[in-house]
Amino acid sequence: MRLTIYHTNDIHSHLHEYERIKAYMAEHRPRLNHPSLYVDLGDHVDLSAPITEATLGKKNVALLNEAKCDVATIGNNEGMTISHEALNHLYDEAKFIVTCSNVIDESGHLPNNIVSSYIKDIDGVKILFVAATAPFTPFYRALNWIVTDPLESIKEEIELQRGKFDVLIVLSHCGIFFDETLCQELPEIDVIFGSHTHHYFEHGEINNGVLMAAAGKYGNYLGEVNLTFEAHKVVHKTAKIIPLETLPEVETSFEEEGKTLMSNSVIQHPVVLKRSMNHITEAAYLLAQSVCEYTHAQCAIINAGLLVKDIVKDEVTEYDIHQMLPHPINMVRVRLSGVKLKEIIAKSNKQEYMYEHAQGLGFRGNIFGGYILYNLGYIHSTGRYYLNGEEIEDDKEYVLGTIDMYTFGRYFPTLKELPKEYLMPEFLRDIFKEKLLEY
């Protein structure tokens, strides 16, 4: 018997591209003279797309239904960018199996409509699908989820199903380095479908006998794995990717649909808020002030590139605010000494990333822009640092409000190790909208 498995990962609500992939599968799957499956590896949802924001991911699930998805798992965007309740209802209308072994609530229950593993019987061959997602522990904790060690959860689930399956497939939203470890730890795995780190393999990769397959990001590729079975075991396995550029174009209206769904008015009077990458504008000041107030901090730091578009309108809608601040970025409250706060101010004053093309960590803009400091100051001639007009004391504890993308080590390594509290699920646009109501 032969089985073809199509796979996508990290679509991130690039729904026009996904529609092309969906059309390709709709045309080609019926032509196969053997069984086929389609699996998605998570991060299909991304709230930077208006239609995804407006439907809290339900549109993405509807598209997966239309694509005749068979099995899917969750990525950090499904798990961490919507509320606890929203994840519990995300898959209410799903016509496919959603599996993830390492996210539970405080009572030990999986999210609604999600199973810890799944066995699919195809012509007598029993295929076990086990999945896990990346363990961003503090973020899940802030949303009242518990994320467990993915390696241990996968091992435990395999042992629970031992004797019930012929073929073992892992759906991993944990990244390529985790997948490589998994190959060494569990060589009995037949295929690992990978994601999260946006990697891809043109023809798959065999690692310790395990076939690794991955299809990049944003729908740039559709993955295809072909398995041949004899006596209920895999005897041959190959992988390839199909570039998006080789697929026919289609017409879509996702942006217009999202705009319509977010057309409700927020402010009914003229607003002029412009952005700049290299100096403080009123919009940047208001955003920094919003972060400081929302985090109940004494000061705040943001970057100007967070403001992606101007708002110059006689009336402001939800869509306008989303376009200005499309990022799935949360706020964070950091406690730190005066010494550490001075280090952060000094580093921000260097403006190392002002004109850098930034990507990842939730950032959905283009240019990073200059740092905007709120309630913080530095007098170069005296070498003194100030908070709200008072000199910062080395041994005193302060509270800084900022954004989660600064806490991963890329921009401010100091922040990675400091005690912090992530404030979720509100995004920058949510707190900025509240500030604009005072405008």
What role is predicted for each listed range?
Residues M1-P243, I280-Y285:
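Acidic, metal/ion-coordinating pockets
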Residues L168-L171, Q268, Q298-A304, E356-G360:
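Flexible, glycine/charged-enriched surface loops at secondary-structure junctions
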Residues N220-M262, V266, P270-K274, L307-N330, ...:
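Catalytic centers of hydrolytic enzymes
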Residues M277-H279, A297:
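A structured phosphate/pyrophosphate-recognition subdomain
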Residues Y285-L286, H296, A304-L307, D314-E315:
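C-terminal, charge/polar-rich interaction regions
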Residues H296-Q298, Y439:
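Short helix-capping/linker segments at secondary-structure and domain boundaries
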